[in-house]
Amino acid sequence: MTKLKFFLLLLTWAMTSNAQDSLPKKLSLTEIVVKGKKPPVSFKIDRQVFRAAEYANAANGNAIDLIKNLPSVSVNGQGEINLRGSASFQVLINGRPTQGDPAFVLAQIPASSIENIEMISSPGAAFDADGKSGVINIITKTAPEKGLMVQSNIMLGAPPFNDFDNQRYTSPQRHAADISVGYQKGKLDLSSGFNYLRNDMAGYREGDVNTTIGNIFTSFPSNGERSFKRYNFGGRLSAGLQLDSRNRLEAALYSGKKYQTRVADLLYNNSRKNMLTGAQSSFDYFNKNTAEKQGVFTLASLGSSHQLSKATQLSFSLQYEGADLESLTTNQNLSYPGLKQMIQETINPSTNPLHAYRFKADLTDKKGSRTWQAGYQFRYDEQTGDFLYKYRNAGSFEFTKDPFFSSQVTVRNNIHAGYLQYGHAKGRLSYQAGLRAEQMLRNLSFSDNVPGNRLPLLNLFPSYLIRYALAEKVAIKQSFTRRIKRTNNFELNPFPEREHSETLEQGDPALLPELTGIWELGVEHKLSKGSFTMSLYHQRTKNPIQRVNKVFNDTILGRIFTNAGLAKQTGVEANLTYRVGKVWQMIIGGNIYKYDIRGTLFNGSLPFTNNSWVYSINATQGFSLRENWSLQLGINYLSLRATAQGEDGAFFTPNFSVKKTTKDNRWNFQAQWLFMDAGLGISNIQRITTRGSNFYTTTNYVYEPDQVQLSVGFNLIKKNRKISLPQSEMAEKEF
């Protein structure tokens, strides 16, 4: 009997050690401490959920450093974020939609404050129709039930190993600090945090441009410094109050500032040749260019939910989003050598604030396995851009306004939307289908008596998703959704804006929004020690917005926003997570697609076609060693990608980290080696090429490799419960 009791006790211990999530939630134990690890990726009917803690290489960074590791996300050398090859996607913060530029919004969120990232590639009718490639929902950390959470990090970057012998920005600085605090007790739930990040980057640029106007061939290759000084800081506060068993209030406030100065000090070798006579002339000049941008981002929301009955819930939310954006571009052309004579100087100050308001009402009725959802949303946003261009030539002391490059543009959008969605789950089959109707009115007005533009649109956005479990751990799903990419101030502004010495940008007030239909077929397979997902998708985009080039004069190219025909994209996305033994955790994701675009440019005068295969690979290999040491190697690779008039070159960034965690999990110490290169000249480099019948331009951007960072983190989670049973993949499945 004693042996039997011992055996049963041993068996019970083994079961709680290896399958603790099978224990009932209400089991009260006081002397057992259970350890477990959540899976890196989990699934819901309409989304994949990625654990932020799996990506140690993103520590001390922001949300961009995290999401670039997801299978369908890529970030190029210019910092542009693409989801399935498109920069048009919507960012949610804890389910609250944002309207600003995704890169600007994500840069305000410290990576250490993020719990999960939800990827929704086929959003239903209950979601906004914005974002043609889907939705990314950032879930931030909160306090445990009836407990306290305190988490902080401090980072210090090492001096640069390669500053390219730059003359202006000689000492890039990198340091960061953040703190998050959460508290939950009774009916009250509070979370707050503050973060600061300074993340300069040295860089170098080499380019070549040539134009042909009549018989004159002009070439102006250039090279020189292209560095960044940048920082951002912000605070966040959210509160939830359970008034009673049926009613709850929630409020949240996010506010942050982002600042960036980009310097481009370039030596130009300008030469002209008459193709008929052979006559040539040349001269050199030095272009000193500084682009300063800053903005304050604010997101405030107030919401309530009301349980009308056991099956019916009504919720309301009111949200304000503001972005006070300012910029100043200074451009000086100096004689070379010597740099003593000013040939021309221009300044280009601008303000472009965004104010957006949103009201939502949602009704959910759930009876058994059937769920009805209906809702209404009103959106109003206004963006007023004031773009000023002044110049002075040699010998002049006063700046003169140039009306050709100066403008005021105001865009106002009124959007009324309603939706109806039905969902049903029975046995192995679950599905949802819905329809969203949207009435939009875009009003565009300009300064200087330029006629405005009024665009009313009525669009329907149908969607459906079907998921069927072939077996206990294997499911297939098929979906369709229709999405929209709206236009912004820069894309609509018909006045040319002088970006720097060799380029200007110009919009089109008649520009139409992009409309995209997305078909998807996927499979989810839960493995014994991981998971595998694969999705085949096809996108058709009507009125794709392209930024194309044409010659403005012999030394300036004009970048013009225009609708360009029809774009199609067919691809496969896959992600594998697998644990090999107790040491090795691998996460390998990738996306490969064929992009095909064809149509006409410049009012039908120039037919074009271009296509290419594009692929990206994001891989993370983690190793858990003895005494709480861990290593992680991450690789992000983006292949060459075709554009309307050229191609964007490949981009490769490997990263490595070493981490030591104390036994009580209170402290961690980490060293990071970012943009690993070791003198090979292959990391953090990208070439952009564009060509036309009478011009050619190519630019190679070389950014600082081999960045080293050291950090210390503190983590305290205090729970007022005697035992906590962490969720596992099995428990998530049952839930």
Where are these regions (language model features)?
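Surface-exposed loop/turn segments flanking beta-strands in extracellular/periplasmic regions
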Residues: 202-220, 270-284, 329-346, 382-409, ...
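Outer membrane beta-barrel strand-and-loop segments of large Gram-negative receptors
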Residues: 356-360, 400-407, 508, 512, ...
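C-terminal beta-barrel architecture of Gram-negative outer-membrane proteins
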Residues: 592, 597, 614-662, 667, ...
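Membrane-proximal, glycine/serine-rich, low-complexity loop/turn segments characteristic
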Residues: 20-31, 37-271, 287-324, 362-381, ...
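Signature of Gram-negative outer-membrane beta-barrel scaffolds
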Residues: 373-472, 601-602
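Extracytoplasmic loops and strand-loop junctions of Gram-negative outer membrane beta-barrel proteins
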Residues: 119-120, 153-155, 160-164, 217-223, ...
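Hydrophobic h-region of N-terminal signal peptides that target proteins for export
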Residues: 10-19
